[in-house]
C-alpha cells in the first residue's frame, strides 16, 4: 500500500507539472501616461499616417510587436489616474464596483473584495513577478490601514522602493526626514549624473526657507539639463521637459528592464541585483506571469540625450484651445483647467513639452523591444508558449488638448489608450490584426486568466466586469455600445460614458465627506446645474471643445445620459467603503442591471 500511495503521489506531481508547463508564460507590459498616438502602428491603423495629429513619433519596436498579433485601437481606461486604473486592471472590476476611485489605501479585508488576477494565477500554479511600477493601491489589512503587501506577486522589484531607495535611478523626488527620526522636513529632488556623482536639494521645506545653496543646486540642474517645469499649474515643480542626467542604458526605466533580464537569465540560480541584493531567478518548471510596469513617460519627462536630440528640432502642431471654451463648462471642469493649466506656457515651452514627451516615449519603445526579446528568448529556451499583452498607458495624457497637460479628465485624451495582444500560438491570435471594437481595461484580467486556462465563465468568476479579448479577435462584432469610468481626484467625483457618437460626463457625489453611499441618488435628484453635465457631440466635435449639455436642442439628450450613467455608476452594484476600517462598506443596487452595454437612445431626442 505504501508503494501504491507513493506511486500515486509521484504520478500526481508529474501530471501537475506537465499541466503547468502547458500554460503559457505571460508578459503584461504597462506604460504610464502613454498616449496611443505615440505609436506609428496606432496612427496608421486609425488615420493612415504614421505621424500623430501633433507630428513626428517613433516606435519601431512596438510596431513590430503589434504586427505579430492584434492591436485594439479603441481601448479605454476605467479611471484616468494611476491608482484606480491599475486597481481596475488588476481586479477586472469597475471602480464603482470596488470603491476605488483615487489613491485610497484600499485593502482586501472587506467581504465584497475579490482577488486580483495575479493572486488567482498563483493558485493556478503560476509564479507571478512584478518589475517597475505595479501600484494598484490594493493592500493587506495590517491589522490597520497601510502599505502592507497583499501578496499579489511572488517576486517584486519596485522602481521606487527597491531601486531609487537604494540609490539606483536618474532623477526622483522624495520626502526628506530629520536625521535619526521620522520627522518630515520637506521634499528633496535627487539627481544621479553620468560622472557618478549624486546631488540632492530641497524644493519644499516644512519649516524655514530653502537655503541659497539648495537654490543654486536646483538652478544649476535646470540650466544644465534644460529643465521645463509646470509653472502655470498648481504643482509648479512638476518637470514636463528636459534632458535625462544619465544615458539611455542607465535611466530608471532601463534599470527596470535590466532587473527583468537578470531574473530571466538566472533560472533557479542566485544573482546580484543592481543595488547589490542577492535574489534567485525564475523557475522554468512553473509557468510565469510578469507585470512589467514602466514609469515612463510619466513626469518627470526626461528623455535621454540620444533620443532627445532626434526630437528637439521637430516642429509640432499645438492643439487648439481657447479659454472661451471654459465659459460653457461647469465648475469641476474649470477647476481641472486651473489646476492643470498648459495654455499659459509660451509657444517655445509648449514645443519643448511635446518634443520631450514623444522622445521619452521613443526611449520606452527601445526598452520595450529589449524586454520583449528577453522574454521570448526565455520562453524559447524552455520550450514554452507565451502571451504578451501591452497596455499602452494606464490612461492617456493631454499635450494641450482642453488646455491642459495631464490626465484626470473625462475627455478622450485622458481615457483612451490601446492594447496589443500577441500569442506564440497563431491559431489563437493571428498576426496583423487591427481590432476596432470598444474595449475597456477591465477586459485585461479576463484575457490573462483565459490565457492561463482559467474557466472564467464559471459562476465563481461572475465578479469579473470585462470580457476576454479573445472574444473580439478576428471579428468586427461589438460586445458593448459604450464605455464607462469614474474618478474622484483633482476636482471631485466625476463619471464618464463614451460611445461612437457622444461623450458624456457628470458629477456623481457632493463635495463633502459622506458615509458609504449616503445620499447615493444625489446626482440623479439634485438640480441639473449641480450635476455639472458635460456633453460632446462627437459627430461634429471630435476634439471635444464645445459642451452642448445646456444647449436647448441637446437638453433632453443630456438628461437621458444623466439617467443612464447615473443609474449605472450609482445604482448597479456601487460600492463605497471606509477604507480606514476593517469591513465598513455599503453596496447600492437600486438600479441593478442598468449597466447592460446598450444605448437605446430614443431617436426623437437625438439632434
Language-model features and meaning:
Residues 90, 373, 406-463, 467-478:
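Substrate-binding rim/cap in mid-to-C-terminal beta-strand-loop elements of soluble/periplasmic
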Residues 21-24, 31, 36, 342-348, ...:
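Long, internal low-complexity/basic segments
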Residues 87-246:
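Catalytic-site neighborhoods of secreted/periplasmic enzymes
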Residues 412-413, 487-550, 588-589, 597-607:
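C-terminal, low-complexity/hydrophilic appendages and adjacent surface loops
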Residues 247, 251-276, 343-389:
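A long, amphipathic alpha-helix that forms part
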Residues 44, 300-303, 310, 374-433, ...:
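Histidine-centered active-site microenvironments of extracellular/periplasmic hydrolases
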Residues 43-86, 92, 125-129, 317-319, ...:
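Short, structured active-site-proximal loop/turn typified by the sulfatase FGly-forming signature C/S-X-P-X-R
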Residues 21-70, 305, 543, 548-554:
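Active-site-proximal N-terminal segment of extracellular/periplasmic enzymes that hydrolyze or transfer
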Amino acid at each position: 500500500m505504501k508503494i501504491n500511495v507513493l506511486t500515486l503521489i509521484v504520478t500526481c506531481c508529474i501530471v501537475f507539472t506537465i499541466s503547468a508547463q502547458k500554460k503559457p508564460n505571460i508578459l503584461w507590459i504597462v506604460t504610464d501616461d502613454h498616449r496611443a498616438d505615440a505609436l506609428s502602428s496606432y496612427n496608421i491603423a486609425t488615420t493612415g499616417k504614421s505621424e500623430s495629429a501633433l507630428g513626428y513619433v517613433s516606435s519601431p519596436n512596438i510596431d513590430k510587436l503589434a504586427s505579430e498579433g492584434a492591436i485594439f485601437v479603441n481601448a479605454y481606461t476605467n479611471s484616468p489616474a494611476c491608482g484606480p486604473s491599475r486597481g481596475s486592471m488588476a481586479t477586472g472590476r469597475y471602480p464603482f464596483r470596488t470603491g476605488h476611485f483615487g489613491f485610497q489605501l484600499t485593502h482586501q479585508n472587506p467581504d465584497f473584495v475579490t482577488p486580483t488576477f495575479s493572486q488567482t494565477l498563483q493558485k493556478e500554479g503560476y509564479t507571478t513577478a512584478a518589475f517597475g511600477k505595479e501600484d494598484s493601491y490594493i493592500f493587506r489589512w495590517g491589522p490597520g490601514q497601510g502599505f502592507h503587501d497583499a501578496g499579489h506577486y511572488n517576486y517584486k522589484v519596485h522602481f521606487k522602493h527597491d531601486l531609487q531607495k537604494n540609490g539606483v535611478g536618474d532623477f526622483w523626488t522624495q520626502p526628506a526626514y530629520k536625521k535619526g527620526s521620522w520627522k518630515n522636513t520637506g521634499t528633496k529632488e535627487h539627481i544621479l549624473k553620468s560622472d557618478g556623482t549624486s546631488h540632492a536639494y530641497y524644493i519644499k521645506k516644512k519649516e524655514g526657507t530653502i537655503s541659497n545653496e539648495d537654490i543654486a543646486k536646483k538652478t544649476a540642474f535646470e540650466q544644465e539639463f534644460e529643465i521645463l517645469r509646470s509653472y502655470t499649474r498648481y504643482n509648479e515643480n512638476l518637470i514636463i521637459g528636459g534632458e535625462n542626467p544619465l544615458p539611455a542604458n542607465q535611466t530608471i526605466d532601463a534599470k527596470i528592464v535590466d532587473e527583468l533580464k537578470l531574473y530571466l537569465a538566472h533560472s533557479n540560480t542566485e544573482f546580484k541585483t543592481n543595488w547589490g541584493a542577492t535574489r534567485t531567478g525564475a523557475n522554468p518548471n512553473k509557468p510565469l506571469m510578469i507585470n512589467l510596469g514602466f514609469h515612463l513617460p510619466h513626469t518627470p519627462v526626461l528623455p535621454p540625450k540620444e533620443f532627445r536630440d532626434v526630437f528637439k528640432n521637430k516642429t509640432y502642431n499645438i492643439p487648439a484651445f481657447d479659454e472661451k471654451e471654459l465659459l460653457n463648462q461647469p465648475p469641476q471642469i474649470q477647476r481641472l483647467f486651473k489646476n492643470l493649466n498648459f495654455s499659459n506656457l509660451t509657444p517655445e515651452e509648449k514645443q519643448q513639452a511635446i518634443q520631450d514627451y514623444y522622445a521619452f516615449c521613443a526611449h520606452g519603445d527601445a526598452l520595450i523591444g529589449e524586454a520583449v526579446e528577453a522574454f521570448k528568448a526565455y520562453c524559447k529556451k524552455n520550450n514554452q508558449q507565451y502571451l504578451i499583452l501591452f497596455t499602452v498607458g494606464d490612461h492617456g495624457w493631454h499635450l494641450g488638448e482642453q488646455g491642459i497637460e495631464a490626465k484626470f479628465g473625462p475627455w478622450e485624451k485622458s481615457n483612451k489608450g490601446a492594447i496589443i495582444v500577441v500569442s506564440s500560438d497563431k491559431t489563437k491570435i493571428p498576426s496583423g490584426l487591427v481590432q476596432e471594437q470598444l474595449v475597456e481595461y477591465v477586459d485585461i484580467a479576463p484575457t490573462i486568466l483565459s490565457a492561463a486556462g482559467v474557466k472564467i465563465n464559471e459562476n465563481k468568476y461572475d465578479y469579473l466586469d470585462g470580457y476576454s479579448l479573445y472574444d473580439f479577435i478576428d471579428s468586427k462584432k461589438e460586445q458593448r455600445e459604450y464605455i464607462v469610468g469614474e474618478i474622484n481626484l483633482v476636482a471631485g467625483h466625476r463619471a464618464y460614458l463614451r460611445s461612437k457618437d457622444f461623450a458624456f460626463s457628470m458629477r456623481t457625489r457632493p463635495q463633502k465627506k459622506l458615509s458609504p453611499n449616503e445620499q447615493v441618488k444625489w446626482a440623479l435628484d439634485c438640480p441639473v446645474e449641480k450635476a455639472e453635465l458635460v456633453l460632446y457631440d462627437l459627430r461634429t466635435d471630435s476634439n471635444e471643445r464645445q459642451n452642448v449639455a445646456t444647449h436647448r436642442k441637446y437638453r433632453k439628450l443630456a438628461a437621458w445620459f444623466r439617467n443612464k450613467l447615473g443609474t449605472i455608476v450609482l445604482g448597479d452594484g456601487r460600492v463605497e467603503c471606509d477604507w480606514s476600517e476593517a469591513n465598513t462598506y455599503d453596496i447600492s443596487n437600486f438600479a441593478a442591471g442598468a449597466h447592460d452595454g446598450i444605448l437605446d437612445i430614443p431617436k426623437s431626442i437625438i439632434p
